[in-house]
């Protein structure tokens, strides 16, 4: 039975596959070897033949066996009466019954109120990003797919920067990730300097960047690091410069970097002359932000700004990695404009050792074209986007797409680049029934009232509960499902279904990885299988053509790359994309040289931002809730700046909290406090701390550190207590440590993007307990289980401290 992707050893079959999700993970596509005996996973290890990860794995993949066989996992369809929402009164049902309930509700609501009154939610960074717009457009015919994070504050703003300034794709540091022989490829030149701005890729491996590659290049080639972060991260301890910027002031610092490069003439005039537009206007604009002024705003020494910017400007080549700091701020678009400019004006954009560009994803083009779409634009189904298929087959009309999608009339910038609603406006719609009343929601690997993405989650809770019908596609019970849903459709994990993972969702593809099905657990089905089953009952004229998920994937997912059998056998197929694609006509759909923008150049002066009513050049604007913007009367009440969103390796946002080995690493939510601030407030390591803002208060345990900027606290996001009572009002302790309780909605930039996640005012004080029982009794599990499920305890707190083996921030290295 030996094939390229599986082999037999003794009594085991060993499968090679690439990880994505579920459980949650970014599309980094780490290589797995999954050992299976008698239909059950016995061991998971890294795949040494994977050209990027080379056998290494994060704790989440190593704990995948615990995850898929956890006794709390949902492995059968479940239903519950609407009047029992909020209570644990679920009953097992058949797949046919469950999909009938979903499809019949959708058809009835569409007939009575219109398909637009149905919404489909999706989570962040997961494979479900592929599916929830397809659920919306192709299964239900609604334009309203929802990513519920206030201000669409993850990846979308960066996509907008690249779309508006460069025409698309996604810029990423060069670590030879596209070449089969990696660092040995003669085209590759290692970066001399990497500028890490608001990013800790060792923990997050974000969106396709394999973070450990930075360590490889530091060790092999002497690559140097500049970190911009209010916290000294593990990479920060090894950086040449760590600029501990005050959260919310990054744009001022980035403008000062451009000022230094222009002042010292550390720019590539040939590239600027041939391939950029608006350089002179940009230089004129940054004259208002010399390093002396930026130092006062950012809390970074002026001489360090000069030194770090010169280090970046003198490096040949240099590369930029930008993180969530670009997205989760109301001034984030302007920060992104500056960082794209820093990539470009040094001349190392899509150059060896610089910042690579992707050739883009053709499904993104239809969204960027905005109002030019019609149902007759294309005739070949096999090359159509999700939206084009929905229009062509009469599942959705152009009028519905352009006039019924919530929030894009107020924020057309969001509607131009993305395929979803504007989330803050959608929440208002739920609350006010304006412009129309919503009646149904589906949650595809999404937990909007939970602890990961939804600001003011109590508002989402109250609004979603009142809908006529709700369903979820997920693996575990969570607060949203318990509070709001009527049907659960159990979805397969990454090693339980066939599929494909592409770095950066295809916007900058390093490789195409096969997700090869290794095992079957219970009655779980893949996202695609579930879509097909429901779709055949809502729009059979379109969906009946697909016998299985392979047929659909070959038709609509793999068509741009490789046939499934070839993708599966390769396991990893490197993209092998060249450098300097803009010189060879590989970025523009017309095949001409240059960039797919109005000018054919990198637009440092952005016509697209200008079109949508935003300044075409970057500018600094203080945070909406910050030390300089709050009223004097509030300054004593909220003397700290709160930032959140940093990753821990053992969790993905709100997932994995019930997995014993992962919970043991970080058993409690943690708030990072500077040691001087802690001493002044009488806070010691491990104390319970209450964090409050004008919007609410929650509790987390203190980590007292020298490595976080004084006056700044960082709070862990995504924490809940699945070992606690699930029924309302507790909802698994959803409200106790949920830092999103402190964040407002509708604090957006002119574009509709950004929020306060990276910069919010707060106060902290020592308290004596979490609140409620700190050590609840172990959940008694009395569920019917197949023999494959071994007896296993749900995690519960233990006495005494637990050592965190990956507590990098506590390790300081002196240079």
Q: Where are the regions a protein language model picked out?
A:
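Acidic/polar loop patches that form or flank catalytic/metal-binding clefts of enzymes
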Residues: 42, 268-269, 305, 319-320, ...
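Long, low-complexity segments enriched in small/aliphatic residues
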Residues: 368-375, 382-384, 395, 401-412, ...
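C-terminal substrate/ligand-recognition segments
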Residues: 430-431, 435-441, 445-450, 462, ...
